[in-house]
């Protein structure tokens, strides 16, 4: 590997480690030890990179994202092998789907470097699901959910609440007013840990833009091959559809039997009501 590229990756990882928040969502800290070979999935912005970087501390691991322009075009096997040759214990690879033939390369790396740590992550469980056929016996899969209300309360108050199962728990009929206020805030913006940042609204928009501009075209390449000039129109129309879905108040659900006859219609426009036929 080019020395300049390696130094760039090391410096970028050091910046990320220095920027880790002091208070992490409990999902991150409740794992005592991660498996040697790990596939981590979860929605964009839920804290996957923070999770892996937190667990990398105290170990000689190198983090990089497969969409880093410095390494695009580099075969994944060759790149990771070079890192191992330099004495690293392992690698953390984010956005793995950007690496060409990633599942084949990871299988070979697992077989050729049995003592090394390889952690990968991606925002698309669809991508990792496709690779699980080759890797299911080699890599442990962990799904990182969006933040729970319990985790949100910890970030807000510093207090750890026990985990409850709704069916096993008697909930108070008159919850504390402050707790209700926290829940309203959680429902509005608290499912991703970066809500505490000053520019969290811009971060949300950046996630939406990346999904529209990168993720959807990646999963629908045939559309872009047939219509190479559709990029702008795709973004415009998909954005309009998303805006309509977010702001529309009317939702109609039709339930029918096997004969196709509509049995009931449910209208949701602030109030949900059923109309039986």
Where in the sequence are the language-model features?
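Structural recognition of the conserved hydrophobic beta-strand(s) that form the central parallel beta-sheet
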Residues: 92, 117-123, 143
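Short regulatory helix/loop adjacent to the ATP-binding pocket of P-loop NTPases
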Residues: 126-141, 155-157
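Hydrophobic anchor at the beta1->P-loop junction of P-loop NTPases
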Residues: 40
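Conserved lysine of the Walker
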Residues: 48-49
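Short glycine-rich substrate-engagement loop in P-loop NTPases that contacts/grips substrate
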Residues: 60-90
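N-terminal pre-Walker A segment at the start of P-loop NTPase domains
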Residues: 1-30
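Interdomain hinge/linker elements that couple catalytic modules in large macromolecular machines
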Residues: 2-12, 154-277
